């Protein structure tokens, strides 16, 4: 009798907390996010402390400011996508030390991870107001964040190459 009861209980519980595969579109955008996140974090760790102040020309951001800008944007954009309040801001203007910028980058990517964690297929397709004209889906905003991160990773790659460093995406 116990065997029958346990079998019934297991069958009943199997539907309650059943694993749901992630939405394919969300999983695709998340995979791209993981790629750019890894490259940026590796680059931030790889660059020596003294190069964080490096500017190829006086009128562009320093390498450290680029990392701060990426962190600020991650918080702002992923906050828009998730509907959550950003936990940090002002990083580009307030932080210059490598350890502080690496910590801020890590925190910003963790914040974006939480935006992805709550992104079901239905939620991903909800339209929201964003800083760009028109309306955008939550997932579209996360895709925009990926594009923004890749844009500035490209800047980081150029700065690294100018200083004779091989960026993470080119390392074997």
Regions of interest found by a model, annotated:
Residues 13-27:
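Cleaved targeting-peptide boundary
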Residues 3-15:
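Bacterial N-terminal signal peptides
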Residues 22-23, 29-31, 95, 101:
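Short leucine-rich amphipathic alpha-helices used at interfaces
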Residues 30, 34, 38-41, 51-90, ...:
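Short, contiguous alpha-helical
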